[in-house]
Design a protein with these regions (language model features):
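Short internal beta-strands
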Residues: 52-61, 142
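Acidic, His- and aromatic-enriched active-site or binding-groove loops in soluble protein domains
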Residues: 159-179
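Conserved small/polar residues in nucleotide/adenosyl-binding loops
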Residues: 199-200
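Glycine-rich oxoanion-binding loops at beta->alpha junctions
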Residues: 73-104, 116
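N-terminal phosphate-binding or glycine-rich loops at protein starts, especially the Walker A/P-loop
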Residues: 5-51
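Glycine/threonine-rich flexible loop motifs
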Residues: 113-125
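Glycine-rich, charge-decorated loop segments at or immediately adjacent to ligand/cofactor-binding or catalytic sites
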Residues: 65-69, 140-162
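A short helix->loop->beta-strand "cap" motif at the edges of active sites that frequently abuts
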Residues: 50-51, 132-138
Length: 200
């Protein structure tokens, strides 16, 4: 019996490279953004294909995955590429500055989520979607499978208890990928600024 192979969004270059033509690109990713059987990071693949990556956004754990869970991550520069990294998990407001938003035209989001409400990656994605909506930037989710997509379980969040580890009125195990969540966030007008982010 043949095994089906999952092709993650980042590996579908012919479908999204045309959307990046003549654009400055920001990448929201971390150590989970691997392609080609885990041999290469999405950032390296983008640069190898001539994409003009001018900014990196990092979630919890930092861009290279070297920060402990819950640790505040500082802004930095990627040692391998020299590209500036803006932390969206720094213990402060964590919203990107206007100067950072001026560095690019389109955002790529490539994170491996685990499909539970208390994981912070979707909260970070939503924060950046909101900034993109307010500044008129395009937002492209390079989607990855939800490893527990077959499971929807637990109570829906009481929004009076909203926090950085629970920001949407969805069940504990919500059954969605980050791309599907992004569509739902837009469709339900859940962005804090009550605007709609131009997503792909």
């Amino acid at each position: 019996m043949a095994r089906a192979e999952v092709v993650v969004g980042a590996e579908r270059l012919p479908e999204y490279l045309p959307l990046l033509r003549d654009s400055r690109v920001a990448l929201l990713s971390n150590h989970t953004g691997l392609v080609n059987g885990g041999k290469e990071h999405t950032l390296d693949m983008l640069l190898r294909n001539g994409v003009n990556v001018t900014a990196i956004f990092s979630p919890e754990h930092g861009f290279r995955g070297d920060a402990d869970a819950g640790s505040h991550v500082k802004n930095s520069v990627d040692a391998k590429t020299g590209i500036p990294i803006a932390s969206l998990y720094n213990g402060k407001d964590s919203s990107p500055s206007p100067e950072t938003m001026d560095r690019f035209d389109v955002i790529l989001c490539d994170l491996q989520d685990v499909g539970v409400r208390y994981y912070t990656y979707y909260v970070t994605m939503m924060k950046l979607m909101d900034a993109a909506a307010r500044s008129g930037k395009r937002f492209i989710v390079l989607d990855r499978p939800n490893p527990i997509a077959m499971m929807v379980d637990g109570p829906v969040l009481d929004m009076s208890l909203k926090s950085g580890v629970g920001a949407l009125p969805v069940p504990v195990a919500h059954g969605m990928t980050l791309g599907e969540l992004a569509l739902m966030i837009n469709g339900e007008c859940w962005l804090p600024s009550a605007t709609v982010c131009y997503t792909h």
